[in-house]
Amino acid sequence: MNKYVLQNARNYLGDDVEIKPSTRKFKKYMVLKPDGKWSYFGDNRYEDYTQHRDDERKKNYLARAKNIKGNWKNDKYSPNNLSIHILWQ
């Protein structure tokens, strides 16, 4: 886990956030939700902004991710929200 991931997770979810490398295939990280369940996010087959620091790729990813349909915007722990705020900031 690189320094940006932990820093972004603390900024988004607070200093007491529990984030670990994922135990699920093809997922990068898992975050413990208040209900005691884990939320898995990020695809370990692809780089994210915390790895490549390419602003153009960040802009393109965020344009795609923010247009995903569904109720993910109201769930702070949705995989899409976690990816946007932790892996792409």
What are the residue ranges of the model-derived segments?
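Arg/Lys-rich, low-complexity, intrinsically disordered basic segments
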Residues: M1-Q89
